[in-house]
């Protein structure tokens, strides 16, 4: 009897030691694979499949996954007599047209440091335009203090911005915000904003140009 109890206790102890530790993850809960059981550890294949599911989930939640200028934005640009900036200017021309910071943010998808941008705490009434093509993007009336150190808005102007899936950070799908006319990278949008939209358009100051209202 004592030997059987000892054998059972030893087996239980070995099973407990064989269980893998839980690994932290920044994937959405719906995209995670089922928790491992029976001593089966996480595998690279499991994480790869989870990443694919996460990409699919993020793609379905984005308003658009296309990186080309939207038809609405191009139509508006043509109506205003503006050229198709996304195809008419070369990378070298953009370098000459923009400052170093503006080029890094808008054409190379960079991110400025929090609390350093020109407009992160600006409360001046006006319209925020794209620094590359002058398209009006956000009204100051939709700007709010998000506490993040970047200019934040709960709503863009019409169809002047577009969104696409951003998987530049592994296991953390995000929604990139771009100018619909010239494809300039503006920032990212999140679902933790105020009413009435519940959105937070987190935008780089270097991608904007504020035109004050009289």
UniProtKB/Swiss-Prot annotation:
Keywords: Chloroplast, Electron transport, Metal-binding, Oxidoreductase, Plastid, Redox-active center, Transit peptide, Transport, Zinc. InterPro entries: Met_Sox_Rdtase_MsrB, Met_Sox_Rdtase_MsrB_dom, Mss4-like_sf. Residues 58-91 are annotated as: Disordered. This is Peptide methionine sulfoxide reductase B1, chloroplastic. It is found in: Plastid, Chloroplast. One of its GO terms (cellular component) is cytoplasm. Residues 58-81 have a biased composition (Low complexity).
